[in-house]
């Protein structure tokens, strides 16, 4: 194999990969590369993604080739542009690694990439998704890592108020805690930390988790993986597990009215329930339950609190600098952060606990604006206000906060 790939393989240090964002140079491969070359290319792309702690690898087909991007700290960065002659072979190699049908190019496919762990033992899972487009097949690999240093609830970065409230919720014997936020906002990490907290503080409790799929193994928790298109669905698994004498249940996601009804009823009958919902705000989550057909009195009787969270990029500690006018820190850029000015992400969150005022509003079927007004008048600290705490501390910037909260 000749051409730029050999050169790139030698140059591909961490900084070189990311600096291509600012100095974009197409590293187009020559035609006629054999299968071994593509195997090495894909292997190197996967290795480099892990070395940079990328959360996702995108292989995006275009009219002229295939573009490879890494998602780093929530932001997509182009790292390679490869010729069209390699596109099919690259996707075919990914399919082989994921155990997918290499001869079907016209259907979406999903799988898991199995690799030796000599270079990325910290990776727990690699999920592969293939999708046909007008320019060819698009592939995305999502990487799941061992979350060193994030095992405990106290390590996640919650404000003292939210941390204390979550500790109190974990002590309860029944009720429902809902988590909201987009994909990649740390909900699974928070749920895992909550379960570990309960097991440490209250050993001997029966703790069960129903997930799609199981993302990380938690010692002491009975974990069940559902099959959405088979017989083991969320409602089926949940109904059966309630007869297994559980005390604490974590349900990966409330996706439908049937699951919502079972979760709410379980929260009223001596079970502590944790789950997630698709909603942008805590008030929106409460209304979503009503839209699913849950009676207002059931919502107010079972739901203890709603936790809404996001992740924002964290300023690089090595190069951040204060603005003389605002006395707030700004991004700068250095070798440690690959000239981005940011390194890692940090949690921002808001927690709404159902008090008498909010319960009365839900029972009265108040709309979203009315619920938001009640929270504001009650002095609720919303997501952006929690984020400003981190801006003042010099952990992130107002601009980054606005990207997430805006």
State each model region's role.
Residues 6, 12-21, 25-406:
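Short, flexible helix-loop junctions that flank or precede catalytic/ligand sites
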